[in-house]
């Protein structure tokens, strides 16, 4: 399972950037998911009805994995460990990482700087 981060879905919506082709490829393969946090980030950033409609069409094709107790607990462990090491990645990325770890699969992202710090998290390649 490939789990798309916010940045690559934005690339896809814009039709450019490193993530656009990767998202298109994974959509074609039919095993692309995202997280409830990414869904929140995309929808909270809408600036018009048209943009919201476009995002909703994409989200209809990309199921969002929910944050359940196990994902929240895993995210808390991720955040605590990284902050203790002085390498925090913020709450949203901690929740995304916790969700990916909980459900398995690999995260498709351009943000390797943050997500490569998370022990056990598999990063999908963009090419």
Language-model segment annotations:
Residues 5-6, 42, 75, 100, ...:
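Generic structural signal for small/hydrophobic residues in well-ordered secondary structure
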Residues 8-9, 38, 71, 95-96, ...:
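Alpha-helix capping/helix-boundary segments
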């Amino acid at each position: 399972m490939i789990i798309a981060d916010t940045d690559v879905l934005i690339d896809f919506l814009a039709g450019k950037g490193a993530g656009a082709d990767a998202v298109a490829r994974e959509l074609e393969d039919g095993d692309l998911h995202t997280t409830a946090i990414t869904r929140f980030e995309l929808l909270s950033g809408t600036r018009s009805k048209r943009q919201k409609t476009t995002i909703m069409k994409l989200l209809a094709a990309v199921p969002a994995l929910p944050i359940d107790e196990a994902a929240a607990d895993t995210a808390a462990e991720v955040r605590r460990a990284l902050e203790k090491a002085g390498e925090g990645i913020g709450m949203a990325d901690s929740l995304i990482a916790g969700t990916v770890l909980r459900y398995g699969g690999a995260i498709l992202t351009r943000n390797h700087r943050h997500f490569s710090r998370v022990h056990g998290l598999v990063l999908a390649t963009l090419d």
